[in-house]
C-alpha cells in the first residue's frame, strides 16, 4: 500500500514538473501567434498559427529577409496594442529608397523572390537608425508597415522574436523561410 502511494506521488511529481517546464518554455522562449489579415500573403495567410522564437535576437540581430513579430502603438479593435508580423527589409545604417515601385538598399535594387506582386508603393528615402529595422509585408498593396508613419522603423527592443514555424493549417506545417 505504501509503495503505491509513493509510486502515485512520483507520477504526480513528474506531471507537475513537466507542466511547470512547459509553462516556462512558453513564457520565456516561445509565443504562439495567429496571423490576422493578408499583409504577408503569399508567405503567410490569415489564421495561420505560428510559433515565435523569443530568444532569436537576444544574442544576435535580425537578418534581411527574416520574418519577425514586433510591438507597435497601433490599437486592435478591442483597444489592445497590436503586434505585427512583417519581413525585415532594411538593416541598421542602411540607406533605403523606394521609388518607381522598386526597393533599393544602399543604391542596389533588391531581389525579392517571395513577392507575388513586385510593385512597392511609396516614395521613401531613409537612412535607417543604428538600432532600428525597416519591415514590410509581402503583400505590399495592403500591408501597413514601416512605410506608414503610424508604424515607422522598428526599434530592436520592439521585436518580440522571429517566426520560426507554422503549426496550422496542418497541410503547411513546417519552418518559415
What are these regions (language model features)?
Residues 1-83, 154-158, 162-177:
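Protein maturation boundaries and topogenic segments
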Residues 39, 114, 120-165, 170-173:
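Acidic/glycine-rich C-terminal interaction modules and beta/coil loop segments
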Residues 45, 63-64, 91, 128-130, ...:
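Residue-level recognition of short, solvent-exposed, well-ordered loop/turn junctions
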Residues 56-58, 74-76, 96, 103, ...:
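Solvent-exposed loop/turn segments at secondary-structure junctions
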Residues 65-66, 104, 148-151:
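Short, glycine/charged-enriched secondary-structure capping and boundary segments
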Residues 83-87, 91-108:
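Mid-length scaffold segments of soluble, non-membrane domains
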Residues 101, 105-121:
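PP2C/PPM family metal-dependent serine/threonine protein phosphatase catalytic domain
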